[in-house]
Amino acid sequence: MQPGAALQAMLLAVLLAKPRDSKGRLLSASDLDPRGGQLVCRGGTRRPCYKVIYFHDAFQRLNFEEAKETCMEDGGQLVSIETEDEQRLIEKFIENLLASDGDFWIGLKRLEEKQSNNTACQDLYAWTDGSTSQFRNWYVDEPSCGSEVCVVMYHQPSAPPGIGGSYMFQWNDDRCNMKNNFICKYHDDKPSTTPSIWPGGEATEPATPLLPEETQKEDTKETFKERREAALNLAYILIPSIPLFLLLVVTSAVCWVWICRRKREQTDPSTKEQHTIWPTPRQENSPNLDVYNVIRKQSEADLAEPRPDLKNISFRVCSGEAMPDDMSCDYENIAVNPSESGFVTLASMESGFVTNDIYEFSPDRMGRSKESGWVENEIYY
């Protein structure tokens, strides 16, 4: 028996003899960090060793290239399953996890450069760690050799059996960008650490971080980059809205000023505009005075006594029968006593003008003036 086969058989016997609730289980979601794992080696130091990485949260799972790089950074490779015994050993590792649905990446991938019309699909696949083993555990009608290049080991406990039987632990080609769990394998060049003893004499190494410090720094950088991109996206939304906000502020201010001015104009009296358009004539400067009111204001002395410095102008209507259009009467400027004349003209030095608006007609003239004549009266300054 080869040494590798003996190691695998011994590990398998230890796993089968160990109770499931013992402290020697491979991985525990409560004990291990989701991005950590535990090496399982024969005797604690003999190679190869394995580390099964399972994520309860599907969002934390990795695609094929990410899983491959993670194993390499930890000093290993994606697992290459070279014999049927090793396949059963990996199955026991996964069963010991009591894990729910979630496939596992293995280190088998199709090589596009080997693809030709004469090459069978299954012959295009090779192990990424350089192993030349031809052992395969494909499900029925797999691989499909379409756009699915990378290979997973089925782990769907809740899935019903298909046409080829149970899917559990069978191989299937899948798209490399899918998110899955993965298994790392560590060969003889992996340095050993102080192991912990399992029941039955076997030992395992303590849980070690799956990702080194450099990978954690990269995760921090990625988180910072995502936050910065989110801040930039928010800035791209807010900056174009600033001119619109300023326009709204200016428009609101202009409307508010206009409304205030309109209210102020409505509350002011409108007499100023009316005076400007239709000025009220001042009575002291108007030539159309009410002579009757002026006469009432004059004293009886002005009405009774003539004054030597005033010139009385009297008018007399023609006594003829001519029509008003042909009227050519004589008029006389006679200074007579108001009591002797047939009509009276008044003059006032205080008022600055002469008015003659009171006419006393004799009875015989009164009748004739009504029938054939009319009288003109004017104001002389």
From Swiss-Prot:
Glycans are attached at N117. Residues 45-185 form the C-type lectin domain. PROSITE patterns: C_TYPE_LECTIN_2 (PS50041). Gene3D superfamilies: Mannose-Binding Protein A, subunit A. Residues 25-235 are extracellular. It comes from the Eukaryota. Residues 257-381 are cytoplasmic. The keyword GTP-binding does not apply. Residues 330-374 are annotated as: Interaction with NF2. Disulfide bonds join C71-C184, C150-C176. InterPro entries: C-type_lectin-like, C-type_lectin-like/link_sf, C-type_lectin_domain, CTDL_fold. The modification Phosphoserine is found at S286, S299. Residues 337-381 are annotated as: Interaction with TLN1. One of its GO terms (cellular component) is ruffle. GO terms for molecular function: carbohydrate binding; hyaluronic acid binding. Residues 340-375 are annotated as: 3 X 5 AA repeats of E-S-G-X-V. Keywords: Disulfide bond, Glycoprotein, Lectin, Membrane, Phosphoprotein, Repeat, Signal, Transmembrane, Transmembrane helix. Sequence repeats lie at residues 340-344, 350-354, 356-359, 371-375, 377-380. SUPFAM superfamilies: C-type lectin-like. Interacts with TLN1. Interacts with NF2 and RDX. The C-terminal domain interacts with the N-terminal domain of RDX. Receptor for hyaluronate. This is Layilin.
